[in-house]
Amino acid sequence: MFVQILGSAAGGGFPQWNCNCVNCAGFRDGSLRAQARTQSSIAISDDGVNWVLCNASPDIRAQLQGFAPMQPGRALRDTGISAIILMDSQIDHTTGLLSLREGCPHQVWCTDMVHEDLSTGFPLFTMLTHWNGGLAWNRIELDASFTIPACPNLRFTPLPLRSAAPPYSPHRFDPHPGDNIGLIVEDLRTGGKLFYAPGLGKVDAPLLEIMAGSDCLLVDGTMWDDDEMQRRGVGTRTGREMGHLAQNGPGGMLDVLEQLPEQRKVLIHINNTNPILDEDSPERAELVRRNVEVAYDGMSIEL
């Protein structure tokens, strides 16, 4: 299984276009040693030719341009994208579909709840109908694994996660299973397993057991501290309120990952305020000490 990190930042990317927090300002003036990052999206393949896009970020055009296999050049109009999985209906993970309209129809896998949000509050399925058939919906059942014809050697298992529906959702304050999912992706030939959850608000005992059965954990790295937005002076909401488990503090992501010594551990969906973006920060050094990696655009993983 081939996993390509197309984008590794949270919403807004890094540096965020309108932000002058210490990270964004430091990156621009050269005082901060860090890498620019686009908004979170990955691609998965069983052969390196046909790819399943997991979430369609607003930065999708630049991401595809930066990864040569996404334009195999086999025909006058072509793409390496064979299917799309949407793990939630957040703007940061779905608006890239608008930039992919020239390639419609696209086969899209998502849950009932995500499909409802994207047919009502943010009606992408309706909007794109006029583009050569638009988006063909394939339902993700929460209690069953599924395969995708273009990558038959991969088995996808959805994991309902506790998180918040987007503000435009009809059930914004009434969470439902399927608002947000993680994925277990298993290569049926090698047995390699990827656990992917860029939006992870809570890890309970059953989920921890599932993570322990995976080879690589690609997990929510949004914030270092739960009150990071307040500390940086750029917001009032906590990470938990937004459905993200912070790395630091009792019961935080680092405590969770400490219980999984055998797995490869990679943080993704990193907010522009997170001090781990600073490669010289104490927080980044703590990750190195704990053998936890920070995803970057262009990172490749093979399982």
From Swiss-Prot:
Pfam families: Lactamase_B_2. The keyword Transport applies. GO terms for biological process: pyrroloquinoline quinone biosynthetic process. Pathway: Cofactor biosynthesis; pyrroloquinoline quinone biosynthesis. Transmembrane segments: none annotated. Keywords: PQQ biosynthesis, Transport. May be involved in the transport of PQQ or its precursor to the periplasm. Belongs to the PqqB family. This is Coenzyme PQQ synthesis protein B. The lineage of its organism: Bacteria, Pseudomonadati, Pseudomonadota, Gammaproteobacteria, Pseudomonadales. The gene is pqqB.
